[in-house]
Amino acid sequence: MSAHQARKRFGQHFLTDESVVESIVRAIGPARDDRVVEIGPGLSALTRPLLDRIDHLTAVEIDRDLAARLRRQYPAERLTVVEADALTVDFAQFGQGLRVVGNLPYNISSPLLFHLMGAAEQVRDQHFMLQREVIDRMVAEPGSGDYSRLSVMLQARYRMEKLFDVAPEAFDPPPRVVSAVVRMAPLPADRLRPASDAAFETVVARAFSQRRKMLRRVLGDWAALTPWDELGIAPTARAEEVGVAQFIGLADALLAAGAPGLARP
């Protein structure tokens, strides 16, 4: 089979280090009857060992040449190939208890993580290879330089753990950044959740639009509607110092106060 040339427009960097593959599979710990979807299988570095351990795998691949290659390599009863951009795929269609894995294209990693939140009710867990700095932001605590809108939005929905780093030399071609692997498990139904997901998203986005400024100034006309003392948010606080629970409380309070521009559930 002829060699596949990595395509820059798809952000392709193929994992070639077998020890890293083994570490990822060990972290996933797949069981024979698990329902697993792999995003961006590429040259099957993870696909092969997964199929050694599970009965069936669904793979989402945007590159038509790689999709055709996968169909030639594996029988349809073992591997279902969905030839599509993962950003357009409704992952909820794959059923309950879903385990999502993959070496995500770094050029669309954040949009893809937000897209997958729409299927979180169906997901058991997610194991992804990503740019290390993205994972550092995902798991960052309030007050740290990495704490961001991404941190707040994902931590409101998932319990996340950074597992290990992966050097550029583990890939072909090697990326210009260090990668890492993260485990994401959706929080239970009884988690603290906002009254309106849309309002929560709007408030967090506005708060981090000028992260170095005091939150009171960034919120503008919403500031007068905010019960600062009740929320435990200091008058001089910046967005990067406010915890996830406080952001949920802030969004709920602004929604209840009729803050302009916030969508009701």
UniProtKB/Swiss-Prot annotation:
Signal peptide: none annotated. Its main location: cytoplasm. GO terms for molecular function: 16S rRNA (adenine(1518)-N(6)/adenine(1519)-N(6))-dimethyltransferase activity; RNA binding. It is found in: Cytoplasm. Keywords: Cytoplasm, Methyltransferase, RNA-binding, rRNA processing, S-adenosyl-L-methionine, Transferase. It catalyses: adenosine(1518)/adenosine(1519) in 16S rRNA + 4 S-adenosyl-L-methionine = N(6)-dimethyladenosine(1518)/N(6)-dimethyladenosine(1519) in 16S rRNA + 4 S-adenosyl-L-homocysteine + 4 H(+). S-adenosyl-L-methionine binds at residues 13, 15, 40, 61, 85, 103. GO terms for cellular component: cytosol. SUPFAM superfamilies: S-adenosyl-L-methionine-dependent methyltransferases. Its EC number is 2.1.1.182. The keyword RNA-binding applies. InterPro entries: KsgA/Erm (IPR001737), rRNA_Ade_diMease-like_C (IPR023165), rRNA_Ade_Mease_Trfase_CS (IPR020596), rRNA_Ade_methylase_Trfase_N (IPR020598), rRNA_adenine_dimethylase (IPR011530), SAM-dependent_MTases_sf (IPR029063). It is an enzyme of class 2 (transferase). Belongs to the class I-like SAM-binding methyltransferase superfamily. rRNA adenine N(6)-methyltransferase family. RsmA subfamily. Specifically dimethylates two adjacent adenosines (A1518 and A1519) in the loop of a conserved hairpin near the 3'-end of 16S rRNA in the 30S particle. May play a critical role in biogenesis of 30S subunits. This is Ribosomal RNA small subunit methyltransferase A. The gene is rsmA.
